[in-house]
Amino acid sequence: MRRALVLACLAPVAAWASPSMLNQIPTTDLVPEKQVSLQLQNGNTEVSGRSSLFHQPELMPQSEFGLPWNLEAGLDVAPSDPPHDYRPILNLKWTPVREDYRVPAIALGATQLGVGFDPNYFLVLSKTLNYQQIQYQKFRAHHRNIKLRGIRLHGGLLRTANAWRALVGTDAEVNDHFVIYADWISGAQNAVAVGGVFVIDKQNSIQASVLRGNVEDRVSGLILQVTHTFELAHPFEW
């Protein structure tokens, strides 16, 4: 989670992702309890202009912590205003309803909780299309990266400072080392994003995606990120 999601107040289109999100929208996923995910991502996604990723890269450290009671908390350090004025922001997610064969998982959350940022609030539902197959693989779960979750659909609502936005997305596990991500946020200043995750091993992955603004006729953004997940009891175990 993070300053994420959208950012309906920014132009050109900007977006952020995290271990428990797709390219730019939240899912019902949680970092497992007593685990931590660390991520490094570009804070600016523009591909052209003086403030583009290639001219003035802004690295953004991110972290998510798995907590009891189906909770996840995140602490990020994000560029505010001016862009190089980095400040901490908090993110929270709660999944009160877990998925089963018929019922989708449901999550509620808040992002961008910090001085200099406008908070966002979201409600999202996630449903695994091959749920039965994934259940059969549960015995392998502790050997698999948390991004490997089958074929799923996601939908929900995002409340920004001044508007409601629709969220739609999907992720499809191709094999044990590659997952396709695609998602969309409504609104003229938001985007559709398509990308994928290369899963290196249980703990590490690399994600890349391109964004096309809803009112653009070209690729308008690029997201690159590296993620490392580990257990708190064994922080140096690779």
List each language-model region with its residue ranges.
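Cleavable N-terminal signal peptides
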Residues: 4-6, 15
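A general structural motif
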Residues: 159-164, 189
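A C-terminal functional module that forms or caps the active site or interfaces directly
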Residues: 171, 190-191
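Repetitive helical segments and hydrophobic/amphipathic motifs
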Residues: 11-12
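Glycine- and other small-residue-rich loops at beta-strand/loop junctions that grip anionic moieties
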Residues: 158, 183-185
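Transmembrane beta-barrel domains of Gram-negative outer membranes and organellar outer membranes
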Residues: 16-121, 126-153, 173-179, 183, ...
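Short loop-to-alpha-helix "cap/lid" segments that border enzyme active sites
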Residues: 164-170
